[in-house]
């Protein structure tokens, strides 16, 4: 029987923008926990998926159907912090946007973990910039990720260099799910074995699927 925890046991808030992202997140969990009884006086309209993964207790929530953007995400995050007061940091995990270039060979299926680089904080908000004749010009920036998350990125890189990365195992676990198999997703051309590795570029950590015969 799954453990029944308290609100203060959850230290990570995990926000998904789309139901398919929530479903993928739930497939990767180590243990799912029973729902907690919330006090109606809290006025928390989020619906949480509570679980543990990698030794951390997480509260996962998806944005309301049809509500995508900065304002709904901010409202959801605010409610998480009000309900789970021991949350140390929040993660927005899902589909992101990127522009491939000669320096950043981003492709469909890549997993990208951004990190600070020079004056670049690590994440660019799409409406904090403008297009000029010479290219994209940033007009603002977000805060850098928490130190503990940057330390985790460094650990992932070190594990990759030592051949101890478990990223491929995690991806294989997800692909074994009928809902996320290659055939179900229309990726029938990807018949070769695929592994995941970390490739470091300025300001980014890429984890691209690579094919091996």
Predicted region positions:
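Intrinsic-disorder/coil detector with helix-boundary
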Residues: 1-213
């Amino acid at each position: 029987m799954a453990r029944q925890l308290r609100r203060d046991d959850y230290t990570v808030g995990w926000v998904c923008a789309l139901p398919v992202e929530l479903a993928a997140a739930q497939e990767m969990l180590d243990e799912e926990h029973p729902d907690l009884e919330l006090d109606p006086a809290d006025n928390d309209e989020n619906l949480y998926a509570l679980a543990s993964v990698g030794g951390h207790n997480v509260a996962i929530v998806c944005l309301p159907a049809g509500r995508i953007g900065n304002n709904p995400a901010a409202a959801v995050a605010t409610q998480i912090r009000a309900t789970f007061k021991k949350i140390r940091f929040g993660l927005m995990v899902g589909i992101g946007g990127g522009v491939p270039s000669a320096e950043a060979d981003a492709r469909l299926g890549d997993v990208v973990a951004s990190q600070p680089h020079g004056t670049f904080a690590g994440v660019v908000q799409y409406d904090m910039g403008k297009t000029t004749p010479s290219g994209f010009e940033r007009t603002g920036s977000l805060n850098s990720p928490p130190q503990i998350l940057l330390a985790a990125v460094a650990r992932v890189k070190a594990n990759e260099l030592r051949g101890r990365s478990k990223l491929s195992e995690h991806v294989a676990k997800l692909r074994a799910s009928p809902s996320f198999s290659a055939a179900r997703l229309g990726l029938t051309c990807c018949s070769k074995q695929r592994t995941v590795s970390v490739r470091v570029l300025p300001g980014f950590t890429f984890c691209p699927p690579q094919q091996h015969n």
